[in-house]
Amino acid sequence: GVESVAIDPNNDQKVYLACGTYTIMTGSILKSNDGGRSFIEVKVPIAMGGNENGRGNGERMMVDPLNSRNIYFGTRLNGLWRSVDEGMTWKRVDSFPDVTEQTDFSNPQNRMNRGSGIIAVVFDKKEKKGNDAKNIFVAVSLKDRQSIFVSRDAGKSWKAIDNQPVGLRPTHMVMAADRKLYISYADSPGPSDMTDGALWSYD
């Protein structure tokens, strides 16, 4: 299964796929330099769940629009990862907060509605720090605690944004041309057992 797809906004011939069907095994990043006609496989020590709950969340992997060498990938179980060489090598971003979800998964209902890890990465392309995007937003599938984080220094440090809702899980996050974030929420990562949701914006 494919967990996430990213296209270089500066070169649409460069395509990245995060591949792995279930989190019981590690996956791979596939990279194409020719618009998807051929791919290079880069094995990574990251558990992916392209056929698990939350498979419609996203987008987990994004290319920095101000520096195409930088790619961020939000994982289900292994935190936030970054490549600085166009996807050829990957390293965990240790400065990102611990977003482990403490839930009793012995309850079948809890297992069905558990979060799906880091579900979205969004770059603000309007501000630069050095060669990189200065402001990076990350959404995590957390229900009862803060779930949207921002870095104002190109990924060196992170904090939760102010005045965010709790009680629902983020499912998608995008930034409009006016730099406003739009975040959709639901009571489950989906596609199963989703009965409630909301849409919030953040200036």
Identify the function of each model-found stretch.
Residues 1-203:
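Extracellular glycan-interacting surfaces
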